[in-house]
């Protein structure tokens, strides 16, 4: 009987850990873009929706590099919904952006995400985004199938840009 208990315990232990070993999935990714953007004259109170405030922050200029280099066209911007609580701002981002590559190809970018920060200092607490791309360019048409993951950064006050987005194509191995 002791031997059977021992075998049953070993089998249960193996059954518990086999899924972790055999079905564990790994992800891989590559960096697509680093985008630096400057916000132009923004409107502080466009309206409210479900007790959330909204603003419009247009992009005035920007640059990017990675799989291509170029500039951010002064089209689109960010239309976040946000609320403030206990000295912090919690934002739900809604970004529209058009990139123009050095080889004159346009890439439309749409992103959503979160940007939470200390209201008084603009210190970033969380800045993550999800990106989709659209282009008619033959060279970059693979981007139409990419769902990018972005990590954002607030740039120093003396920079000519306000924000940086590092965007990765992440998928299962």
Task: Describe each PLM feature range.
Residues 11-20:
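Sec-dependent N-terminal signal peptides
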Residues 25-173:
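Beta-strand-enriched cores of mature, soluble protein domains
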């Amino acid at each position: 009987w002791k031997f059977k208990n021992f075998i049953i315990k070993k089998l249960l232990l193996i059954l518990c850990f086999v899924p972790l070993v055999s079905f564990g999935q790994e992800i891989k990714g590559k960096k697509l873009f680093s985008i630096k953007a400057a916000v132009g004259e923004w409107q502080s109170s466009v309206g409210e929706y479900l007790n959330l405030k909204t603003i419009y922050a247009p992009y005035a200029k920007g640059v990017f590099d990675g799989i291509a280099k170029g500039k951010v066209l002064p089209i689109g911007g960010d239309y976040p919904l946000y609320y403030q609580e206990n000295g912090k701002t919690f934002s739900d981002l809604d970004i529209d952006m058009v990139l123009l590559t050095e080889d004159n190809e346009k890439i439309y970018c749409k992103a959503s995400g979160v940007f939470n920060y200390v209201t008084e200092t603009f210190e970033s607490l969380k800045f993550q985004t999800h990106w989709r791309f659209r282009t008619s360019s033959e060279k970059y048409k693979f981007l139409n199938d990419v769902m990018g993951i972005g990590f954002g950064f607030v740039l120093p006050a003396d920079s000519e840009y306000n924000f940086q987005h590092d965007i990765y194509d992440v998928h299962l191995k």
